């Protein structure tokens, strides 16, 4: 009996025995055949299969054979037409006589006089139909190659045939509609009408380069057919040529199907319609393998048939680039074998790279950020060049959990002194550069998942820490632990790689019945997010107790360092006596077993909390997104969440002591959107979506407050309006399922609820789709660009541009953000808006940090809520296949989309508000301004957009603004009550006994919303409309005065930054912006309220009124200066505002 490994080797290695007559074919047949295939037994006896198998397997051989055969047939026909092939003399004479008799009365319907028949030189002796047949075959060949080119460029077969149908329509219009005679079909008007019809169809279907080629070919074919097909009527000749073209395209489609596809070509059915043009920028695509010339050659010489890549370079594992089943089939049992060869670093190559970077640094035209990045790489290379070559054996991928192996850069090891940066170099480098040097290659530092330097402080040590703790084999869930993990060198090891390796193993084990996927905030799968996710698992949010409204209820709730996550597991390899289900901590995501109930029980309000004891731990990987906004405190990971799990005494100020957290439970059925998926009684309100003051609270009343479907309904309408369902082939049911589960996960709290998420989603949609005066777009005519996007890694629908159906402005004086932001990035912005406050507890980041909440410990006190929102929302997305509405995105697109969503959510942290505003102001005031072809600039614009949408309440009309103000104040008061019950100092504006509503809103507008709107407006990105001269003369009083204060100077700055000189003619024109008008009006309203309160307080006690009055007058003066000089940079105001934050 053959061993499976031997069978696999027989499949992969050439077979030298078997069929003696055709050894090559037999070898290929054995190589490609499936052992279980029924063809395997009969392939030896089928001589035709043995001969054709090499042709089918080799793309070059099949293409060469096809081209050669067609060329031979064409040459043969041409020679027959010219009479160069011998024929019977009597037949030639008979053909000549018949030709003379037929030519005597004249050709009916002919265009040019003269004899019919073949070409000069003996062609008349042949059959009179041979020349037309040869000509039609030539036209068929021409369209064959053109059709093959179109199909391989991504054009579908019906669209290609539709182009020729458009030509037929043009011919019918010329001959029947316009009444052009047969003698004038070659005239310029007739040809112009036909080619115009073809050009119109081409403009909608093809890119510019393909369209020009199609028009040129069709024009030439039409002319040749009208001149040369003399055996047919003139009116029939173009249709015969088009018929030959259809046959040629059909033949091309058939040939394309039988020829093997290239590895880089995407499936034709996934390209979609080409109605949306693509972008100009080149999108990098993952290659299957990267090699270093000298290193790989040395490796191959030392280990014969085994080839290795340089593990010092980052690489995406193959199992992420293809399905697990395909990867397992390709690698076979050999994938688990370990090679003990060493990895060498070529010092000469590093020296050459250092020299190239030094030459680049000598260029004075490089931007400062590029120079800084290159200087960082140069310093790293120069440091490594002082050391000898590093030899480090590869780690055996089969790692036993009982070995307690550790591979963390932040811990002591024998190789750390060689790999880490010397302390003398760390002291000599500036902090910003040091953070860049220590960064890791992950999705945080690269939007597309490729290795690029990111100026954000991403620390390598935090993202590369992996620990495999010792676990007894008798653990109840030991079968669920990853037992095989491929580890690369620590310098290139990332969290995304570690998790993907673990998930690859877990996917195999969890494919068995009863296996459940473990959801953890730390996991971030890189490949298809739902591979390996069983159908029996679900993450469901169930709120045990809502936030209390008084201190009495908060004092009665239970304590717990872990939020227990219990579920039942079943596995085939579990022993029957194990009945205790494992418990998962929902804060850190790791399983732990419950200890003895008698061991130090903590009882409060009748609830006993047992101290957990850790028995098992899977690979721990800290998320890269935790370090986006970090300070320069330390490069060593602190496992505070692990310490929190083992901590027995609970502090009084713990967040768990104040409220019962939501429990995540694994259920048998997912949360699915109810029927009907789209509610049909909301059309009257949904028609107002294109207004800034959308009546969202009226929509809540119509839907029903207890229904909770507002987010999914509005999301569907906005996605459908933008055409995103068609552009990305989004399945509607999965889309509605996820967004319904997402809105259910929002808690019923006063402000940060599903209504707020819907309002933010509507705001970002409005800011990106409505007309913006003076904004130039990178595309024209709604999606038509140049033909320079054919090398892009994405299809047109994915990297093209989408427009709202409500955007019907044809004036080039207006533009919109959706014309500058690709569709994938725009959809990521919308999804981020829907996710951005998911599972918000109704407390601020400062409160969670002060009370040492589990989330604060998990995310190291940095952007705690924002990290939690993103992690929880993505965990929900990856928990069920019913939620995967991004199923048609490939690996690179999904990684890019996930990166954009997370970055947009993290940007909503108000602690980083002034940093974003200052960075954006610097970009706007730069000579170049916003470069829409730069992905980083577009990301910054999207971050500013979602920040403005998140705090858009003061920019709404008075009625909506007061409703939102009531919600945030009530939520603040609940936090103040809890702080008082815990003995903590009450945060400003959160004391229910001393309300300061007017001061809160006035300060928030003056210091937060005002500067943000000012920066956004100064960049020329605020929707509005030009104020015509007639409107200016008709306006009086307030509107015009307010417009003179703010938008007029702003338009000067906008026009100066525009590249087009035409915009300078509108330098003096005014812009009416509804958003800024509401902001100014609401600010004036709160100032009047403050003045009235001060006046009433002054009547009672004049002496106590002096200090607050002077302080308020300073704030009022500051906002007046802002209104009058809105176009000026606000750099001098920011330092005075930060202390107020």
UniProtKB/Swiss-Prot annotation:
The enzyme class is hydrolase
Q: Which GO terms describe its biological process?
A: apoptotic signaling pathway; cAMP-mediated signaling; cellular response to cGMP; cellular response to transforming growth factor beta stimulus; cGMP-mediated signaling; G protein-coupled receptor signaling pathway; lipid metabolic process; negative regulation of adenylate cyclase-activating G protein-coupled receptor signaling pathway
- Region (Disordered) residue ranges read 1-42, 436-482, 590-640, 1023-1062, 1100-1141
Q: Give the cofactor note text.
A: Binds 2 divalent metal cations per subunit.
Point out residues bearing the modification Phosphothreonine.
Answer: 1036
Q: Where is the composition biased (Basic and acidic residues)?
A: 1125-1141
Crosslinked positions (Glycyl lysine isopeptide (Lys-Gly) (interchain with G-Cter in SUMO2)): 1120
What name is this protein filed under?
A: cGMP-inhibited 3',5'-cyclic phosphodiesterase 3A
Q: Which organism is it from?
A: Homo sapiens (Human)
What taxonomic ancestry is recorded? Eukaryota, Metazoa, Chordata, Craniata, Vertebrata
């Amino acid at each position: 009996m053959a061993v499976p490994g031997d069978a696999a080797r027989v499949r992969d290695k050439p077979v030298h025995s078997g069929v003696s007559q055709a050894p090559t074919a037999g070898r290929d047949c054995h190589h490609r055949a499936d052992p279980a295939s029924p063809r395997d037994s009969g392939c030896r006896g089928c001589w035709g299969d043995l001969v054709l198998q090499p042709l089918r397997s080799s793309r070059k051989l099949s293409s060469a054979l096809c081209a050669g055969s067609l060329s031979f047939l064409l040459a043969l026909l041409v020679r027959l037409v010219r009479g160069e092939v011998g024929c019977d003399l009597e037949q030639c004479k008979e053909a000549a006589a018949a030709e003379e008799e037929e030519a005597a009365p004249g050709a009916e319907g002919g265009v040019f006089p003269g004899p019919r028949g073949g070409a000069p030189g003996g062609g008349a002796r042949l059959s009179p139909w041979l020349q037309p047949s040869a000509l039609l075959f030539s036209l068929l060949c021409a369209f064959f190659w053109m059709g093959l080119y179109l199909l391989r460029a991504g054009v579908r077969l019906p669209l290609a045939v539709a182009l020729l149908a458009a030509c037929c329509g043009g011919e019918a219009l010329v001959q029947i509609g316009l009444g052009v005679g047969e003698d004038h079909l070659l005239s310029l008007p007739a040809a112009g009408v036909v080619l115009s019809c073809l050009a119109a169809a081409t403009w909608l279907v093809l890119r510019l380069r393909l369209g020009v080629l199609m028009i040129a070919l069709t024009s030439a074919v039409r002319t040749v057919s009208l001149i040369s097909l003399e055996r047919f009527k003139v009116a029939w000749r173009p249709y015969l040529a088009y018929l030959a073209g259809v046959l040629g395209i059909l033949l091309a489609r058939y040939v394309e199907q039988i020829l093997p596809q290239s590895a880089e070509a995407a499936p034709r059915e996934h390209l979609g319609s080409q109605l949306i043009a693509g972008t100009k920028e080149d999108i990098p695509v993952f290659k299957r393998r990267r090699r270093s010339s000298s290193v790989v050659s040395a490796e191959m010489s030392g280990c014969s048939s085994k080839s290795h890549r340089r593990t010092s370079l980052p690489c995406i594992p193959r199992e992420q680039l293809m399905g697990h089943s395909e990867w397992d089939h390709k690698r076979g049992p050999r994938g688990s074998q370990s090679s003990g060869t060493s990895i060498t670093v070529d010092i000469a190559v590093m020296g050459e790279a250092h020299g190239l970077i030094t030459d680049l640094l000598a260029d004075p035209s490089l931007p400062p950020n590029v120079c800084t990045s290159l200087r960082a790489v140069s310093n790293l290379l120069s440091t490594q060049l002082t050391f000898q070559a590093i030899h480090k054996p590869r780690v055996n991928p089969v790692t036993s959990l009982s070995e307690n192996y550790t591979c963390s850069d932040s811990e002591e090891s024998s190789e750390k002194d060689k790999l880490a940066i010397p302390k003398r170099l760390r002291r000599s480098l500036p902090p910003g550069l040091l953070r860049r040097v220590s960064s890791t290659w992950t999705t945080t530092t690269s939007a597309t998942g490729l290795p690029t330097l990111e100026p954000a402080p991403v620390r390598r040590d935090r993202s590369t820490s992996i620990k495999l703790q010792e676990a007894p084999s008798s653990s109840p869930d030991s079968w669920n632990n990853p037992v095989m993990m491929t580890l690369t060198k620590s310098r290139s090891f990332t969290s995304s790689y570690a998790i993907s390796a673990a998930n690859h193993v877990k996917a195999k084990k969890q494919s068995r019945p009863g296996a459940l996927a473990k959801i953890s905030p730390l996991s971030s799968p890189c490949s298809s997010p739902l591979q390996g996710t069983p159908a029996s698992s679900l993450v469901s949010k169930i709120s045990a107790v809502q936030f209390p409204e008084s201190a009495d209820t908060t004092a009665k709730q239970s304590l717990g360092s872990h939020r227990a996550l219990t579920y039942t597991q079943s596995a085939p390899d579990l022993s029957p006596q194990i009945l205790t289900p494992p418990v998962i901590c929902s804060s850190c995501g790791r399983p732990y077993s419950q200890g003895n109930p008698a061991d130090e029980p903590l009882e409060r309000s009748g609830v006993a909390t047992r101290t957990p004891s850790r028995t098992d731990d899977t690979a721990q990987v800290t998320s890269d997104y935790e370090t986006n906004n970090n300070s320069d405190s330390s490069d060593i990971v602190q496992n505070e969440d692990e310490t929190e799990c083992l901590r027995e005494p609970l502090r009084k100020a713990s967040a768990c002591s104040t409220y019962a957290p939501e429990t995540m439970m694994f259920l048998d059925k997912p949360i699915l959107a109810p029927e009907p998926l789209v509610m049909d009684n909301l059309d009257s309100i949904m028609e107002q979506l294109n207004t800034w003051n959308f009546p969202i609270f009226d929509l809540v009343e119509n839907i029903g407050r207890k229904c909770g479907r507002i987010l999914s309904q509005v999301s569907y309408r906005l996605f459908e309006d933008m055409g995103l369902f068609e552009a990305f082939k989004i399945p509607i049911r999965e889309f509605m399922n996820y967004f319904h589960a997402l809105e259910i996960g929002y808690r019923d709290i006063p402000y940060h609820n599903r209504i707020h998420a819907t309002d933010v989603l509507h705001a970002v949609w409005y800011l990106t789709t409505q007309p913006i005066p003076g904004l130039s777009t990178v595309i024209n005519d709604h999606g038509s660009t140049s033909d320079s996007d054919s090398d892009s890694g994405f299809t047109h629908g994915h990297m093209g541009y989408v427009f709202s159906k409500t955007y019907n402005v044809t004036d080039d004086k207006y533009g919109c953000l959706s014309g500058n932001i690709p569709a994938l990035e725009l959809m990521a912005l919308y999804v981020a808006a829907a996710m951005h406050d998911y599972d918000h507890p109704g407390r601020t980041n400062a409160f969670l940090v002060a009370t040492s909440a589990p989330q604060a410990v998990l995310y190291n006190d940095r952007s705690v809520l924002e990290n939690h929102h993103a992690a929880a929302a993505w965990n929900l997305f990856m928990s069920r296949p019913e939620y995967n509405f991004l199923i048609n995105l490939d690996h690179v697109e999904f990684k890019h989309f996930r990166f954009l969503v997370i970055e947009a959510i993290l940007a909503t942290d108000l602690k980083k508000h002034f940093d974003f505003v200052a960075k954006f102001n610097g970009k706007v005031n730069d000579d170049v301004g916003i470069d829409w072809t730069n992905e980083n600039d577009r990301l910054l614009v999207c971050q500013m957009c979602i920040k403005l949408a998140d705090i858009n309440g003061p920019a709404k009309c008075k009625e909506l603004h007061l409703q939102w103000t009531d919600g945030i104040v009530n939520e603040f008061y609940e936090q103040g009550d809890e702080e008082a019950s815990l003995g903590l100092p009450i945060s400003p504006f959160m004391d229910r006994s001393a309300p300061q509503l007017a001061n809160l809103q006035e300060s928030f507008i003056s210091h937060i919303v005002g500067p943000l709107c000012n920066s956004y407006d100064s960049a020329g990105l605020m929707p509005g409309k030009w104020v015509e001269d007639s409107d200016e003369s008709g306006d009086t009083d307030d509107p015009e005065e307010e417009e003179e204060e703010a938008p007029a100077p702003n338009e000067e700055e906008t026009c100066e930054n525009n590249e087009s000189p035409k915009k300078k003619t509108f330098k003096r024109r005014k812009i009416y912006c509804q958003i800024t008008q509401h902001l100014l009006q609401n600010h004036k309203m709160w100032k009047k309220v403050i003045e009235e309160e001060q006046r009433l307080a002054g009547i009672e006690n004049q002496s106590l009124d002096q200090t607050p009055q002077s302080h308020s007058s300073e704030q009022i003066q500051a906002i007046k200066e802002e209104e009058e000089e809105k176009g000026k940079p606000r750099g001098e105001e920011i330092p005075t505002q930060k202390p107020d934050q």
